[in-house]
Regions:
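Metal-dependent phosphoester-hydrolase catalytic domains
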Residues: 25, 214-224, 230-333
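Solvent-exposed loop/turn segments at secondary-structure junctions
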Residues: 31-35, 112-116, 138-142, 153-155, ...
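N-terminal, active-site-proximal structural segment of metallo-dependent hydrolase catalytic domains
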Residues: 18-124, 138, 300
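Structured beta-strand-rich core segments of catalytic domains in phosphoester-bond hydrolases
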Residues: 106-108, 112-187
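Sec-dependent signal peptide recognition
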Residues: 3-11
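Hydrophobic h-region of N-terminal signal peptides that target proteins for export
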Residues: 10-20
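Active-site beta-strand/loop signature of hydrolases that rely on acidic residues for catalysis
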Residues: 26-31, 75-81, 85, 92, ...
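Extracytoplasmic, non-cytosolic globular domains
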Residues: 43-45, 107, 134-135, 165-166, ...
Length: 333
């Protein structure tokens, strides 16, 4: 009997992670236009409205000015009613909590319209241990902001706008969401980013990364930066953009995720890119838990044969986003 107890103790000792009390998990997910169904006159949400609100001449004329045909058709014909919106919310929530049984400890979202829709998502996943959320309305006219949902208390948050160089100095873009969260009696910084899209000059993404570095240098707190960096494989291969961050940051997909193709698939170029990734600060007493960096892929958000993201289909009400979520576990030393 004593031998059994000893063996059980040794088995338990070696199975239970030594650092489990000092670990937390993160997920970053671009939710691809998560809008409510209400008209906000201060934001460009005209594509995401119920069809009955799209019948006026004013609305139709506004849509006809859109140059991209798919966006124009969406503006004219998409019926973004309450049921469709709820279907997207439920699909997102289902995939979030499918990670690690009850969802990540810290969830960073991009392309969230406002606090109203964020609160609705929070209410769906709150039973899984989430206690706080934050979204600060930015100047972005498109109405797609960054947000945090957390199982730990958010202490403070603010926005940092990015000043671009050269001919783009007057360009405005989405700011960096800076959030301080207390985890295991330690304060950590989280930077949620959504940098300029690929049709903008690459210098704007590099300026954004330099801004992120400057924020990190202003303090000594352990820090996590995550989100949609919008750096594609072509420009990264040429300019080593992610590699150049390693003086201050440990870049998730360069440190792990060995079998990951990317978080976004470009159909026209038939290529994968890590638009979305996770950084943690170097030499600040945090590191990645080995083998924890991955893409969170389910049968609902990725095709089984190709791994490509399944974007939300408002007719079938299936799918989640055109981006795959990246996840990691981080250890506080």
């Amino acid at each position: 009997m004593h031998k059994f107890k000893i063996r059980f103790f040794l088995l338990f000792f070696f199975i239970v992670p030594i650092y489990s009390d000092s670990e937390f998990s993160v997920m970053t997910l671009n939710v691809n236009n998560l809008f409510d169904e209400l008209d906000d006159p201060k934001k460009d949400d005209k594509a995401y409205l119920p069809i009955e609100l799209k019948q006026s001449k004013k609305h139709i004329n506004s849509c006809m000015k859109i140059r991209v045909n798919s966006w124009k058709n969406e503006c004219l014909n998409l019926d973004w009613d309450k049921d469709t919106k709820n279907a997207k919310l439920n699909n997102i929530a289902r995939d979030i909590v499918a990670y690690d049984e009850d969802g990540p400890d810290i969830l960073a979202l991009q392309e969230v319209e406002n606090e109203n829709i964020l609160r609705q998502l929070f209410n769906l996943i709150e039973p899984f241990g989430y206690i706080d959320y934050v979204l600060i309305e930015s100047r972005d006219y498109r109405g797609i902001d960054t947000a945090i949902i957390s199982k730990f208390k958010v202490l403070d948050s603010r926005l940092h706008y990015i000043k671009f160089s050269g001919e783009f100095e007057d360009k405005d873009t989405r700011p960096i969401l800076d959030t301080t969260i207390e985890i295991k009696d330690k304060k950590l910084k989280f930077y949620n980013v959504h940098f300029p899209a690929g049709y903008h000059d690459v210098s704007m993404r590099i300026d954004s990364l330099n801004k992120l570095k400057s924020l990190l240098k202003k303090h000594n707190m352990p820090s996590v930066a995550l989100g949609d960096f919008n750096v594609n494989t072509e420009e990264d291969s040429e300019l080593f953009i992610y590699k150049d961050q390693e003086d201050l940051w440990d870049v998730a997909h360069l440190s792990g995720c060995e079998n990951c193709k990317g978080t976004y698939y470009y159909s026209y170029g038939k290529s994968w890119s890590f638009l979305d990734t996770i950084f943690i600060s170097n030499k600040r007493n945090i590191d990645y838990v080995p083998n924890s960096i991955n893409l969170h892929m389910t049968k609902y958000n990725a095709y089984a044969d190709t791994g490509k993201p399944i974007r939300f289909n408002p007719i079938k009400r299936t799918g989640v986003s055109d981006h795959l979520p990246m996840v990691a576990k981080i250890r506080i030393n």
